[in-house]
Amino acid sequence: MQKFECTLCGYIYDPALVGPDTPDQDGAFEDVSENWVCPLCGAGKEDFEVYED
């Protein structure tokens, strides 16, 4: 699965990691609620871009 990066603060959403920062168990970013926000800065889902390692 792809990782996504917050363009405002640099937080990396990694669907392989399940924990308090991930909104659901399967982790696919496309399936995350539109109401979800970055756990570090509160940016909306629209402020994330595909992260290239």
Swiss-Prot record:
Biological process per Gene Ontology, one example term: alkane catabolic process
UniProt keyword list: Electron transport, Iron, Metal-binding, Transport
Claim: Transport is one of the keywords in the record: yes
Requisite cofactors: Fe(3+)
UniProt xrefs under SUPFAM superfamilies: Rubredoxin-like (SSF57802)
Entry-linked Gene3D superfamilies: 2.20.28.10
Keyword check for Zinc: no
GO MF term set: electron transfer activity; iron ion binding
Residues binding Fe cation: C6, C9, C38, C41
Cofactor binding note: Binds 1 Fe(3+) ion per subunit.
Domain Rubredoxin-like: 1-53
InterPro entries per record: Rubredoxin-like_dom, Rubredoxin_dom, Rubredoxin_ET, Rubredoxin_Fe_BS
Family statement: Belongs to the rubredoxin family.
Role, per record: Rubredoxin is a small nonheme, iron protein lacking acid-labile sulfide. Its single Fe, chelated to 4 Cys, functions as an electron acceptor and may also stabilize the conformation of the molecule.
Protein name, UniProt field: Rubredoxin
Organism: Peptoniphilus asaccharolyticus
Native organism taxonomy: Bacteria, Bacillati, Bacillota, Tissierellia, Tissierellales
